[in-house]
Structure formats: C-alpha cells, structure tokens
Amino acid sequence: MNIHNAVNRALEVLEYLASRKQPATLTEICQHLDAPKTSMNPIIYTLLARKFIIYDPASDTYALGSALYKIGNEYLEKFDILKYVRRVMDDIVSICSETCYFATLDGPNVNYLLKADSTEKIRMVSSIGTTFPAYATALGKCMLIQYSIDEIEQLYPEGLKPLTPKTITNFNVLMKELSDVKHKGFACDDEESYLDVQCRAVPICRNGAVIASLSISTPAFRFTSRKEELILKTLLQKKSVIEQTLNDSQVDLSVLL
C-alpha cells in the first residue's frame, strides 16, 4: 500500500513541531523537511484550519494546537490500564512530592506516556511526547536490560552520544550498568539526561518480560539520601501493585507495545 504524500508530510510537520522546545517558523519547517514553501503552504493552512497547529503573528511561528491535545486525551481515556497507572502515579506524587513518569520503549528512544507533576514549585518540565535516547535515562535503562550488547549496538549505530558530561558513552560501561540494574531492581540517571536532575526508575514486567518503566525525577538539590530511600521504597512498592494488576487481569496492553 502506497503512502499518501500530502498526509505523510502533514504528519511530519506535527512530529517536527512536537520534537522542538520552541515554536518554528515556516522557513525552519521547510528546511527541516527539505520541502518548498509552495508545496507546504496548503498543508500548513489545513493544519491551522483544523487547529492541529497554531500561528503566532508576533513571532511569525507555528506550534502544536489544541486539536492534538483533545485527540491525545481521548486516546488515553480509551485505555483502562493507563488510567489505572495514572492513579498509582498520583499516589506516588502524594508520597514523594516529586514528578513521576511512565514510559515504554520506542526503538532506541523512551516514549513518555504519562506524567504526574510534582507539588513543588521547582519541578521537572519534560512533557508527554518528549523523546530521549534510552541509554541516557533511568526509564530507558530499565527497558534495555533485556537486550544484548549486539542488539544495543544495532539500536545506536552512531554510538552513544552524550546529552550531558555525565552521559554514558561506552557500550561496555552501559552493559555493566544494565547488569547492575538487573541485580538491584532499579536504574539510576545521575544527571545523564539533564544536569542537576536525579532520576530513579523501576522496570514494569508482565509474565517476566519488561513492557514499561516507572520513574521519579527530582532536582539534584532536593535529592538527599533520605529522599532517595523514600523514592526507591515507593517505586518498588508501586511496581508490585501495577505488575499484580497486569498479571491478574486480561487488560489490553496494545497501547504499551
């Protein structure tokens, strides 16, 4: 079956805007997609009319629109397992007062499905839909433990690129870290994806296979030994709760695959 070029191009525009931290000009969009403005204009106008993107005349830039938010919420509402996990995450935040994430693996990257915000004024700002290479995050390390070094090298043919000076960039060092994750039952991100941010995560398994991961992130200045102890205790407890539900029920897990 052939891909419809115009539809595919519209989706590429949305993916590009989602990948950016800031809105983009039409020139930037066209340069990224290697497309002329004449062919992009009808696509942009259609996305604007349907509210999939918005336009800011003051900065002459485009950003994601409310239609995507609505569709995303409706999508999540259809999956009881995500609603259940979200309730567990809210409980985690009430205990630890830090930001909680639930994610799956999408090729070489972490796919953030859910986020429960910290109650603190200073908190994490990563959004749903953000992607990070799995090797640089605690969430990702939890899901890479099932991979061999050959498989991981295939995931990252250009090597392990640093996001911060503390990112692991050596495959052998990463494999040692993943072995430690298997042994300890949790993974660490010690300022490897963001400077001044600490993260701890646990794998979520069903029938012995890792299908997702759950994490708590906190600014480094709040990450005391007592805070880490509370975070790990809470994550491991809630991991058991979620896994029991997954293993005891016939829930549809297609959203996690």
For each feature predicted by the language model, list its residue ranges:
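Amphipathic alpha-helical regulatory segments at dimerization interfaces
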Residues: 32, 84-95, 184, 241, ...
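Short, highly charged C-terminal tails/helix-capping segments
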Residues: 248-257
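Amphipathic alpha-helical effector-binding/dimerization core
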Residues: 63-158
